[in-house]
C-alpha cells in the first residue's frame, strides 16, 4: 500500500523535474493505526519503513537521498528524542503535542 501511495503521488512529476523537487517536498510517514491513538510504532518499524521509502525514492525516482522523510504518529516529548535518533528519520510531524506549548518546546529541544 505504501509503495503504491508514493508512486501515485509522484507519478505526474516528469523525470527532468525530479531534481528540482528535492528542496520542495517532504514525505511524512504516519501509520494509520497511530493517528490520534497514542500508539507509536517501534523504533525498528520506523527505521524499516523509512529505509524502504528512501530506497524506493532512490531506485524508482533517483531522488531518495535528497527528500526528507519525517515520522508522525503520536510523537510527544517523551518519545521524540528516541525517534530523532532512528536512522533515516529526518524529523517529526507533531500533532496533538503541538497544542501544548511546553511539550512542543521539549520536542524542539530534543531535535537539537
Where are these regions (language model features)?
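Active-site rim beta-loop-alpha module in soluble metabolic enzymes
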Residues: 1-64
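Short alpha-helical interface patches
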Residues: 18-20, 88, 107-111
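Hydrophobic faces of well-ordered beta-strands that scaffold small-molecule active sites
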Residues: 25-29, 65-73, 90-94
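Active-site-proximal loop/turn and secondary-structure-junction residues that shape catalytic pockets
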Residues: 31-33, 75-77, 98
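Residues that form or flank phosphate/diphosphate-binding pockets in enzymes
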Residues: 36, 78-79, 102
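Short, glycine/charged-enriched secondary-structure capping and boundary segments
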Residues: 41-44, 83-86, 106-109
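Catalytic cores of alpha/beta
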Residues: 75-89
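C-terminal helical cap(s) of enzyme catalytic domains, especially alpha/beta-barrels
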Residues: 98-112
